[in-house]
Protein backbone atom coordinates (compact mmCIF):
# COMPACT_ATOMS: atom_id res chain seq x y z
CA UNK A 1 0.00 0.00 0.00
CA UNK A 2 1.30 3.42 -0.93
CA UNK A 3 0.13 6.50 0.99
CA UNK A 4 0.49 10.00 -0.44
CA UNK A 5 1.42 12.59 2.18
CA UNK A 6 -1.60 14.84 1.78
CA UNK A 7 -3.62 16.94 4.23
CA UNK A 8 -5.47 13.80 5.24
CA UNK A 9 -2.26 12.14 6.37
CA UNK A 10 -0.62 15.24 7.83
CA UNK A 11 -3.60 17.03 9.38
CA UNK A 12 -6.46 14.53 9.49
CA UNK A 13 -8.46 16.11 6.65
CA UNK A 14 -10.42 13.08 5.58
CA UNK A 15 -13.17 10.73 6.62
CA UNK A 16 -13.46 7.08 7.52
CA UNK A 17 -16.03 4.42 8.24
CA UNK A 18 -15.48 1.24 10.22
CA UNK A 19 -17.93 -1.43 9.10
CA UNK A 20 -18.68 -4.54 11.13
CA UNK A 21 -18.31 -7.86 9.31
CA UNK A 22 -20.35 -10.80 10.61
CA UNK A 23 -20.33 -14.19 8.88
CA UNK A 24 -18.65 -12.56 5.87
CA UNK A 25 -21.37 -9.92 5.47
CA UNK A 26 -20.81 -6.19 5.87
CA UNK A 27 -23.35 -4.83 8.35
CA UNK A 28 -25.25 -1.73 7.15
CA UNK A 29 -22.77 -1.22 4.28
CA UNK A 30 -25.15 1.05 2.36
CA UNK A 31 -25.62 3.33 5.39
CA UNK A 32 -21.89 3.52 6.03
CA UNK A 33 -21.16 4.43 2.41
CA UNK A 34 -23.88 7.11 2.35
CA UNK A 35 -22.47 8.66 5.54
CA UNK A 36 -18.93 8.55 4.15
CA UNK A 37 -20.09 10.16 0.91
CA UNK A 38 -21.79 13.00 2.83
CA UNK A 39 -18.61 13.57 4.87
CA UNK A 40 -16.44 13.73 1.74
CA UNK A 41 -18.85 16.19 0.14
CA UNK A 42 -18.86 18.34 3.30
CA UNK A 43 -15.04 18.36 3.38
CA UNK A 44 -14.95 19.22 -0.35
CA UNK A 45 -12.62 16.33 -1.16
CA UNK A 46 -14.79 14.58 -3.71
CA UNK A 47 -17.43 11.89 -3.64
CA UNK A 48 -17.41 8.11 -3.66
CA UNK A 49 -18.55 8.16 -7.31
CA UNK A 50 -15.68 10.45 -8.29
CA UNK A 51 -13.29 8.05 -6.55
CA UNK A 52 -14.86 4.98 -8.10
CA UNK A 53 -15.62 3.51 -4.67
CA UNK A 54 -18.57 1.13 -4.86
CA UNK A 55 -20.32 -1.38 -2.62
CA UNK A 56 -18.93 -4.12 -4.86
CA UNK A 57 -15.37 -2.88 -4.32
CA UNK A 58 -15.79 -3.04 -0.52
CA UNK A 59 -17.43 -6.48 -0.68
CA UNK A 60 -14.67 -7.76 -2.96
CA UNK A 61 -12.00 -6.47 -0.56
CA UNK A 62 -13.59 -8.33 2.37
CA UNK A 63 -13.82 -11.53 0.30
CA UNK A 64 -10.21 -11.18 -0.89
CA UNK A 65 -9.04 -10.78 2.72
CA UNK A 66 -11.13 -13.84 3.73
CA UNK A 67 -12.61 -11.74 6.54
CA UNK A 68 -15.55 -13.54 8.14
CA UNK A 69 -15.87 -11.74 11.48
CA UNK A 70 -14.26 -8.44 12.36
CA UNK A 71 -14.23 -4.99 10.81
CA UNK A 72 -13.43 -3.32 7.52
CA UNK A 73 -12.19 0.28 7.70
CA UNK A 74 -12.36 2.57 4.69
CA UNK A 75 -10.37 5.82 4.99
CA UNK A 76 -10.55 8.52 2.31
CA UNK A 77 -8.56 11.74 2.01
CA UNK A 78 -7.91 14.04 -0.93
CA UNK A 79 -5.20 11.80 -2.38
CA UNK A 80 -5.77 8.43 -0.69
CA UNK A 81 -8.28 5.62 -0.42
CA UNK A 82 -7.22 3.02 2.13
CA UNK A 83 -8.92 -0.27 2.98
CA UNK A 84 -7.96 -2.02 6.22
CA UNK A 85 -9.32 -5.00 8.09
CA UNK A 86 -9.06 -6.57 11.49
CA UNK A 87 -10.25 -9.90 12.81
What is the predicted function of each stretch?
Residues 1-87:
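Conserved alpha/beta cores of soluble small-molecule-handling proteins
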Amino acid sequence: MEITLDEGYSFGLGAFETIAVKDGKLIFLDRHLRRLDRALHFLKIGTLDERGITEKQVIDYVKQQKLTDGACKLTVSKENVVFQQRQ
